[in-house]
């Protein structure tokens, strides 16, 4: 065997690729890709290097960065004329709060919460869910805001009504690729839900447990705003894997965001991090950026409570217009800078969920090479 053919042997190729991947650093990686055992397959065919990764959390946006940073080096050391990259996902199922049993078909539940209303929690939740789906996951969203359900309107599905195939369970409403359910599908817009906390909590638990969810990697839970009895009850009884707290940079919002973090800590729900919504206002005429609600608030809050600042979302008229039309930005403007930010947020949320959690043995395994 000559030196050139030996360099292209399966063992040598895999070692070259693994060595290059080990040097790739990214905010979503606590350990490198080689340690993560993400390298699934390496092959050589017709002067083309074929590389396949299998990740336990959604990673598409970071994968694009990987290709940009590593392709030139791999072409140089292998002598390949081209690289065929492939990314697959085998999403991990992570242990839930107090090892509670999960919802049938649902691997992980991500609660999106805020200490107060009006900070953009629901808009963040719906775009996060769509971004997770765009990154390659199977995703659902449950509108847990019993008193102010807005997810049906944001998804353009407000006129749909759920069906019951067996007279007991509800089939989810499919919208933009998401499996969804909401009290908003069951009541009219002008019908106020005048329920006490225990009744509202019971209704939500029924919606969660009696919906015929398809197999989902992530179920996003749009929590009611606040930190009162209903929020505490939900946090204690729903099989949540991790929570995201949404706030604005404004001091008054940050005060209530602190309460949300403390609430989740008390019920032992891992806080994945903080999303700073309306971080800056972007003028639709000139593009000027202005931090109308202040700066640095969420970053300081994350430092104080030893958690992550997962993302900073801007305030722009197009984001509001897209939601009002029932086609959120991730769907209506897939190539926009705003969608790119949401997809990066999805990667970071999914990665943080994985690194903070513990994989349930037997529910996920990497495919053998």
Question: Can you name each region flagged by the protein language model?
Answer:
Residues 325-336:
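C-terminal boundary of histidine-terminating zinc-finger modules
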Residues 187-234:
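Phosphate-binding/switch loop-helix module in NTP-utilizing enzymes
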Residues 344, 348, 357-369:
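A short, charged, Gly/Pro-tolerant segment at domain boundaries
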Residues 109-143, 261:
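Walker A/P-loop phosphate-binding motif and the immediately C-terminal alpha-helix
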């Amino acid at each position: 065997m000559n030196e050139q053919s030996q360099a292209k042997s399966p063992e040598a190729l895999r070692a070259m690729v693994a060595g290059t991947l080990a040097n790739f650093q990214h905010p979503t990686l606590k350990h490198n890709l080689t340690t993560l055992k993400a390298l699934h397959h390496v092959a050589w065919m017709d002067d083309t290097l074929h590389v396949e990764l299998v990740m336990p959390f959604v990673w598409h946006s970071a994968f694009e960065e990987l290709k940009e940073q590593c392709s030139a080096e791999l072409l140089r050391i292998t002598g390949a004329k081209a690289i065929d990259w492939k990314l697959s996902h085998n999403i991990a199922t992570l242990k839930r709060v107090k090892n509670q049993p999960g919802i049938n078909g649902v691997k992980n539940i991500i609660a999106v919460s805020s200490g107060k209303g009006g900070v953009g929690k629901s808009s963040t939740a719906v775009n996060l869910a769509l971004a997770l789906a765009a990154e390659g996951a199977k995703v659902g969203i449950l509108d847990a805001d019993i008193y102010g359900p807005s997810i049906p309107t944001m998804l353009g599905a407000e006129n749909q009504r759920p069906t019951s195939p067996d007279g007991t369970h509800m089939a989810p409403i499919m919208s933009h690729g998401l499996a969804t359910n909401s009290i908003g599908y069951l009541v009219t817009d002008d019908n106020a839900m005048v329920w006490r906390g225990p009744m509202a909590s019971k209704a939500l638990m029924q919606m969660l447990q009696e919906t015929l969810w398809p197999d989902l990697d992530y179920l996003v839970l749009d929590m009611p705003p606040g930190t009162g009895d209903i929020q505490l009850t939900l946090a204690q009884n729903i099989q949540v894997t991790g929570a995201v707290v949404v706030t604005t940079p404004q001091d008054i919002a940050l005060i209530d965001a602190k309460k949300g973090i403390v609430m989740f800590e008390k019920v032992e729900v891992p806080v994945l991090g903080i999303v700073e919504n309306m971080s800056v206002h972007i003028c639709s005429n000139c593009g000027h950026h202005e931090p109308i609600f202040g700066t640095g608030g969420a970053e300081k809050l994350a430092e104080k409570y030893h958690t992550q600042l997962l993302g900073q979302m801007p305030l722009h008229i197009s984001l509001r217009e897209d939601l009002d039309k029932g086609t959120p930005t991730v769907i209506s403007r897939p190539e926009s800078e705003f969608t790119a930010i949401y997809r990066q947020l999805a990667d970071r949320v999914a990665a943080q969920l994985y690194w903070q959690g513990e994989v349930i043995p037997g529910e996920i395994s990497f495919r053998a090479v």
